[in-house]
Design a protein with these regions (language model features):
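Short, well-ordered beta-strand micro-motif
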Residues: 4, 117, 145-147
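Active-site flanking residues adjacent to catalytic metal/cofactor-binding acidic residues
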Residues: 81-84, 105, 146
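Conserved hydrophobic/aromatic beta-strand scaffold that supports enzyme active sites
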Residues: 102, 115, 143-145
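Glycine-rich phosphate-binding loop of ATP-grasp-fold ATP-dependent ligases
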Residues: 61, 111-115
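Conserved N-terminal catalytic core of the sugar/cofactor nucleotidyltransferase
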Residues: 3-4, 8-81, 86, 91-92
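Short acidic-glycine loop/turn motifs at beta-strand connectors
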Residues: 117-123
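Catalytic-core segments of class I nucleotidyltransferases/pyrophosphorylases
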Residues: 95, 123-168
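Conserved donor-nucleotide/metal-binding helix-loop-beta segment in metal-dependent transferases, i.e.
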Residues: 89-112
Length: 168
């Protein structure tokens, strides 16, 4: 997130886009370099409402999202964006989807990404994490709109309690 692009950290571009889209509340998941990220956010974005969650053990994206549960109301729609990718997307259009939504992009070598397999209507049939034999070339790019937050938290809690993981 702190890697500079044209003199500005990646997370700065991401936050500028989200703030311009009208998002007012943020929960940041901190792990490696967490204090430096927090310092950057406090110095560069003092006016946004923010909470911090510490992910002390790197147990994956699902666990990181689960840790945010205490800060998010059950009736909330939640936009999740990973902090290491700048996207050229209209966040407002994305947020107005009536469905749970994730952003995807065609890539040359899908083995380096989580990918989606779509049905005939363009609905996600399944997600496959870094497949050796790709089911598609549609990579998940780290932007998710969750319309049913309580269901997601319940599923993540079940996965964590049963030790279900995609890798490791």
């Amino acid at each position: 997130p702190l890697i500079p692009v044209a003199g500005k950290p990646i997370i700065g571009y991401i936050l500028d886009q989200l703030v311009e889209s009208g998002i007012e509340e943020f929960v940041f998941i901190l792990g490696y370099l967490g204090e430096k990220i927090k310092e950057f956010l406090e110095d560069s974005y003092p006016k946004i409402k923010k909470q911090y969650v510490i992910q002390s053990e790197r147990e994956g994206l699902g666990q990181a999202i689960y840790l945010c549960g205490e800060f998010i109301k059950d009736d909330s729609e939640v936009l999740i964006q990973l902090g290491d990718t700048i996207l050229d997307i209209d966040i407002q259009v994305f947020m107005h989807s009536k469905y749970n939504t994730l952003a995807i992009r065609k890539v040359q070598d899908p083995r380096e990404f989580g990918v989606v397999e779509l049905d005939e209507q363009g609905i996600v049939r399944r997600l496959v994490e870094k497949p050796q034999i790709p089911v598609s070339n549609l990579a998940i790019v780290g932007l998710y709109l969750v319309k049913e937050w309580p269901k997601l938290i319940h599923c993540l809690e079940t996965n964590i309690k049963t030790g279900r993981k995609t890798k490791g």
